[in-house]
Amino acid sequence: MATISAVQVEFLEFPAVVTSPASGKTYFLGGAGERGLTIEGKFIKFTGIGVYLEDKAVPSLAAKWKGKTSEELVHTLHFYRDIISGPFEKLIRGSKILPLAGAEYSKKVMENCVAHMKSVGTYGDAEAAAIEKFAEAFKNVNFAPGASVFYRQSPDGILGLSFSEDATIPEKEAAVIENKAVSAAVLETMIGEHAVSPDLKRSLASRLPAVLSHGIIV
């Protein structure tokens, strides 16, 4: 059995296992990493992102990816796409390293999501309406350092949003968006072809081989 460990990103700790009071489910940490931008030649870290997976992700991903090395997985887009589209629930935590207005944060997320959906032909009126609902959820949110947004993604295309002043998962979700393309696009922009966090991709690729080969013990 592989032991799941916590991951530290700057001052943010991503525990090995979390239970969501909103869904009642327990998730293990697939990986975590930083997201930043190079501004005037200096890399500034803005956010730590952790991707948590439901335990049924292990047999689902192992069917195709068991036995692959970290080096093989990190360069394989289909591996990440199988995490994104897999028939298991995901819980993504995005915690701020620097303060950020919710509207500013969501604007960039939405731009990336819309660009991806347009590129793959999944953006239509329903997706535009879902993106509007996404924007509305963040309108009055301001993230202090350590504050978090949680994205709960169910296999049937439901995206649950919740906000916390720390790493605590709220009991109630602030918004629920029922749109599979938008839900998938959120994670795609983080770990897909044009990922905002290569660090997160590396973390998933380094941690999951042992889990897929040996199962998990937490």
UniProtKB/Swiss-Prot annotation:
Species of origin: Glycine max
Entry's EC annotation: 5.5.1.6
Family: Belongs to the chalcone isomerase family.
Physiological role: Catalyzes the intramolecular cyclization of bicyclic chalcones into tricyclic (S)-flavanones. Responsible for the isomerization of 4,2',4',6'-tetrahydroxychalcone (also termed chalcone) into naringenin.
Binding-site list for substrate: 47, 112, 189
InterPro entries, alphabetized: CFI (IPR044164), Chalcone_isomerase (IPR016087), Chalcone_isomerase_3-sand (IPR016088), Chalcone_isomerase_bundle_sf (IPR016089), Chalcone_isomerase_sf (IPR036298)
Example GO BP: flavonoid biosynthetic process
Tissue expression per record: Expressed in roots, shoots, flowers and seeds.
Protein name: Chalcone--flavanone isomerase 1A
